[in-house]
Amino acid sequence: MRMRLVLAFVSLLTTTGLAQTPPQDNQTVKVGPWTVATTYEADKFNHCTMSSSAEDLGISFVRDQDELSLVLDSSKWKLERGKAYSVRLVAGSQSIEAKALAQAKSVTIALTDRPFNGKLRIANALEVRGEGATLHVPLVGSAAALERLEACFDKNERESTETNPFVAPSRKP
């Protein structure tokens, strides 16, 4: 009797602990040279990332509820934290002006132009042209990886949305 009670208690603790942790399946997936990962903060979905590297350049595309962003980092950089550097992004025959927001060793570039983002899916490379240099960002295999990034975001955003089962959902056009 005592053994059954102990086993039941251990089972309850294990089940409760598993129910409180975010889902562990498919949190990191390799898609060609890219790694697509899910990030949680305080047990809530935060964003999905698609990462790779080329020489000393770290490359990450981050998809959160607001936008798609490109994060570039290098241990060789010495940037002015908080500064917004003007850059020109070139993918194939299309280019746009953007701002690269700096940290000490990285920059974040918001990718808000939908037609340009579509071009990223089919381009072999992205050029990030700054005043001092042009960075060559290889995009080999990025079409499939970007699709997986969007699927990661859609799936986790849908699953993390808090709902009230006792009221009708709001209808939005």
Regions found by a protein language model. Name each.
Residues 6-15:
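Bacterial N-terminal signal peptides
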